[in-house]
Amino acid sequence: MNNQADKGRFFPPEWYPQSGIMLTWPHQDTDWLPWLAEVDALYARITREIIPHERVLVVYRDEEHRQHIVNMLQSMDIPSSEILFTQSDSNDTWARDHGPITVYDQQHPVLLDFGFDGWGGKFKAERDNLINKTLHAHGIFPGCTLQSLDIILEGGSIETDGQGTLLTTSRCLLDGIRNPSLQRRDMERILRENFGIDRILWLDHGYLAGDDTDSHIDTLARFCSADTIAYVACKDPADEHYAELLKMEQQLQDFRDYQGNPYHLVPLPMPRPHLDEEGNRLPATYANFLIINDAVLVPTYEDPHNDQEALTRLAGAFPERQIIGVNCSVLIQQHGSLHCISMQLLKDVI
């Protein structure tokens, strides 16, 4: 057994014990405005599913926004005893990418605060980039060290097995826009230093149409355990994703786990195509699930056959956890899904 937690710097997997989930709640000055009532209700539904398992940290914009959220939760009979409210203005709601990443240093929780630039400057992010510092200054993370770094890195771009392995995509981390002065060797050094990892698995293939993130790993392939990876598989040769996802699958088959064995691979179906108002395809993916204490929240997309197949396959990958489907069709209207809007805060953080 590779006891990574006994090392100086430890990057835990998502199934590590959690103290809470961070949600940066949508408001009327975000791009969610056309769908605000629907996305509000979805955030409330997600909150309802999480609080039996752990706390929810709700980041609200101002007092009027907080009161709106409280009133809505009360109207839905959602108890607030496990909800922690904190104020910080925001450009958008993608907590996975602007939220803090929990590591442990000598078993002490450290929150990594990487720079966030709206996925290579595609969108404004100056307020999102201050959220972690604001929350830390508010005392939301008592006893935690906040380590701010100048490097641009999003939480959705990295996965770990908790055994010293980091899984990521070259298309995102080496895009030449986020960190133009960094080569692969530089990025690998930064990842090793800050996450305490031993090895990096680079996926060079795989994308989703409509994805703004340049192939975040959390849209494509996810660790379910130290020896199991769930991934998006495309079975339709006529689909534009077919060739790239086949190459990704072949690369995953070539990877070895931390003990030198092939990974157990769990193929997830692709949902039926979802289109925006202009007819452009939206990045619906079942790989964007969220692991919480004793459960897994899985995005569904009003596609009964594929939704059920994804839930069944993930139930097999997480036999000791409750599998909870959550309709996330509205989230893909802004090109993300369930994992993208949430960030786990591991034990002893809140």
Language-model regions: role of each:
Residues M1-I350:
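The feature marks the mature, well-folded catalytic cores of soluble enzymes
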